[in-house]
Swiss-Prot record:
CDD domains, per the entry: F1-ATPase_delta (cd12152)
Subcellular compartments: Cell inner membrane
GO biological process, one term: proton motive force-driven ATP synthesis
Molecular function via GO: ATP binding; proton-transporting ATP synthase activity, rotational mechanism
Membrane topology according to the record: Peripheral membrane protein
Gene: atpC
SUPFAM superfamilies recorded: Epsilon subunit of F1F0-ATP synthase C-terminal domain, Epsilon subunit of F1F0-ATP synthase N-terminal domain
Protein name in UniProt: ATP synthase epsilon chain
GO cellular component term, pick one: plasma membrane
Main location: membrane
PANTHER family: ATP SYNTHASE DELTA/EPSILON CHAIN, ATP SYNTHASE EPSILON CHAIN, CHLOROPLASTIC
Keywords, comma-separated and alphabetical: ATP synthesis, Cell inner membrane, Cell membrane, CF(1), Hydrogen ion transport, Ion transport, Membrane, Transport
Family from the record: Belongs to the ATPase epsilon chain family.
Function summary: Produces ATP from ADP in the presence of a proton gradient across the membrane.
Amino acid sequence: MAMTYHLDVVSAEQQMFSGLVEKIQVTGSEGELGIYPGHAPLLTAIKPGMIRIVKQHGHEEFIYLSGGILEVQPGSVTVLADTAIRGQDLDEARALEAKRKAEEHIKSSHGDVDYAQASAELAKAIAKLRVIELTKKAM
């Protein structure tokens, strides 16, 4: 039987996931993180993107995170997300429209702050589309 640990994914609105998992993948402030059982304690910021949850028996779930904090402790991991949305709850048409608007905003941006904001919005839209794509494949 595969080793597991307890994972909680919570946002300000609700608890998104609570249960035993084999591993997770998430984007931290320093890059991609793979958290397996026995991982060293860690506290890091999470960048906007997705969390890939591999539950017991290899079943996968994908959740979009707008950012937050990841805490790894012996035997448990907690994700405190600013906003968290399950892949099946994301609206593909809205994500595509947000991507299009962000790309237009980048083209017409004036100044570093404007460009940085548009780039962040584009990254969020692309992350949502990726979560939608992976959720469809996992079903």
